[in-house]
Amino acid sequence: AEHLLVLGHPSLSRSVTALLGREDLDITVLTERARWTDVSGRARRVVPMDGPDHEPADAAALRSARLVASLGLERADASWADSWRRAASDLPEPGCSSSADAVARAVWEASQAPGAPTLLLGSSMTVRRLDRLAQPGAAAPKAVANRGLAGIDGTIATGVGLWMASGGPVRAVMGDLAFLHDAMSLNRGVHEEEADLQVIVVDDGGGAIFSHLEYAHTTPPARF
């Protein structure tokens, strides 16, 4: 890679974070907001994407062409994109190294069906499993996840809120620790309507994410 375009908030995967920290890449951030993601502070430019929400296709194409020209990039031949699509389709299907992996992928695949519930992903290991296991190029379900310093807090309550806001069913998949942190949200008052909410709990040895972080190099494995 020589040039990276960053959209959204790509800080979940350690491998992507490492890529964004490379000094030999020309990084451009495209943003629709006043705050943007620049993980390592190496972005050379920040380009506002201020087009209207429902922009005509020809106007959007023209704006995109101007953006490419301003970055000094040349339009790639269609065969270039096709070669990458073929390469992605030829990748071996990621293997499930544990039963927790298998559950997460099964839930993801079931949620790709037409009319499937909105999918709510628990923080920590659950969302990272699917970041690793979800196949590129496949139809993705509508998925929602909490992010933040206390991402596992309120996961079930978030599912109830999604149901109330959307009026449609919600399917939540989370680890055991995330479930325990918010099990009280399964309670409801005698006059409250029962939410159309599925809660799938993966027994993944709560707090297992810490064994994948820097702490694991200084602490005995049994502590995790």
Feature-to-residue mapping (PLM):
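Short, intrinsically disordered, charge-balanced linker/junction segments flanking boundaries
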Residues: 1-4, 108, 219-224
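Glycine-rich, acidic loop regions that bind phosphate or pyrophosphate groups
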Residues: 1-85, 189, 214
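Short beta-strand segments
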Residues: 6-8, 30-31, 120-122, 173-174, ...
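Thiamine diphosphate
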Residues: 134-224
